[in-house]
């Protein structure tokens, strides 16, 4: 509907609900990851029209139980923030009163009437969400599998952005303020690539008519969805002592195959047979047959070329 702004229709009659996903995608940068994660928190909490968590939730409930959620994700050297709304189709509403327009209006309020004051988020709500995110990250760090995965990525990747988890790190979140996060949000609205996914049953003309009411201007976006790390014939190792009932082994392997390459599907099948599923070689041999690991699996990120193998093992072994 404008340069750098795309609408995707995904028709389906499987569900009683329709889903709208508004995605903002920018370049992956260590300096903005925490800001963007805080933006995702604020989008799901309140806005100027509904300035408290309670009034925000009550409005969603009044829209026949419409659900709103946000998430962040990375793909290659990009970082995305999603705001998702799931609501009942008109056929399942007694009044059949055009719920689509109300839901779209609520989305517009979340995006263009954020809970702000003088070019920054309202401090009271922002401080709560900031603390919630820090607590979430601290709890994750206490999980040995998550902690070892983060440390493995720090050791493997040379790109600073890829070393950082998609929600940031506690120290990065702590450094942000209601002003810096709000300014990042304004930049996202005007500079990020925008993808709007309409999943369900929609009137295409009605959707485009509604979205043209959003002040979405064209933007030039240059994004790198695939990352190919320079090959280095050096094995990096790190051992970190930690109090735990079991030890975690993380292994990272580099593959040059990228999404869409001729070997892409073969590599996906290989990973499934190697370690991703319960019938894979790693699980059936090392865990079930040999008993060398409490748990073991593999995962492959086609957008960075990293094959990760992780296992919970007895520290004596």
Give the role of each language-model region.
Residues 134-190:
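Scaffold signal of the M16-like zinc-metallopeptidase fold and its non-catalytic homologs
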Residues 94-101, 105, 119-127, 131, ...:
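Short, amphipathic alpha-helical segments
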Residues 41-45, 63, 106-114, 132, ...:
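Structured segments of extracytoplasmic/periplasmic soluble domains
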Residues 57, 113-137, 223-231:
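Acidic/histidine-enriched alpha-helical segments
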Residues 1-63, 169-172, 182-285:
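His/Glu-rich zincin catalytic helix
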Residues 46-49, 91-94, 113-122:
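Short, polar/flexible loop-turn hinges at active-site or ligand-entry regions and domain interfaces
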Residues 105-117, 213-221:
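A common structural junction motif
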Residues 8-10, 16-29, 34-36, 53-109, ...:
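M16 family metallopeptidases and their MPP-like homologs
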């Amino acid at each position: 509907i404008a340069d750098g702004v795309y609408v995707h229709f995904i028709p389906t009659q499987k569900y009683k609900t329709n889903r709208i996903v508004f995605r903002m995608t920018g370049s992956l940068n260590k300096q903005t990851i925490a800001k963007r994660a805080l933006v995702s928190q604020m989008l799901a909490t309140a806005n100027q029209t509904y300035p408290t968590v309670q009034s925000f939730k009550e409005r969603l409930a009044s829209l026949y139980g419409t659900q709103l959620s946000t998430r962040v994700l990375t793909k290659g050297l990009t970082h995305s923030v999603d705001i998702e709304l799931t609501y009942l189709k008109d056929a399942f509403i007694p009044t059949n009163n055009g719920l689509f327009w109300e839901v779209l209006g609520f989305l517009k309020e979340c995006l263009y009437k954020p809970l702000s004051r003088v070019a920054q988020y309202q401090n009271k709500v922002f401080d709560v969400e900031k603390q919630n995110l820090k607590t979430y990250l601290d709890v994750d760090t206490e999980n040995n599998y998550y902690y070892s995965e983060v440390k493995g990525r720090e050791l493997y990747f040379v790109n600073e952005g890829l070393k950082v988890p998609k929600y940031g790190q506690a120290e990065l979140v702590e450094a942000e303020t209601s002003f810096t996060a709000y300014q990042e949000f304004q930049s996202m609205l005007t500079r990020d690539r925008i993808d709007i996914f309409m999943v369900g049953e929609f009137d295409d003309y009605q959707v485009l008519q509604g979205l043209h009411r959003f002040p979405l201007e064209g933007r030039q976006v240059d994004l790198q969805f695939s990352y190919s790390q320079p090959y280095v014939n050096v094995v990096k190792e790190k051992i970190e002592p930690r109090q735990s009932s079991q030890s975690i082994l993380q292994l990272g392997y580099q593959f040059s195959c990228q999404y869409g390459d001729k070997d892409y599907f073969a590599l996906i099948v290989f990973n499934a047979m190697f370690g991703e599923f319960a019938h894979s070689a790693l699980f059936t041999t090392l865990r079930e047959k040999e008993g060398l690991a409490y748990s073991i699996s593999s995962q492959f990120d086609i957008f960075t070329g990293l094959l990760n193998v992780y296992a919970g093992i007895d520290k004596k072994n």
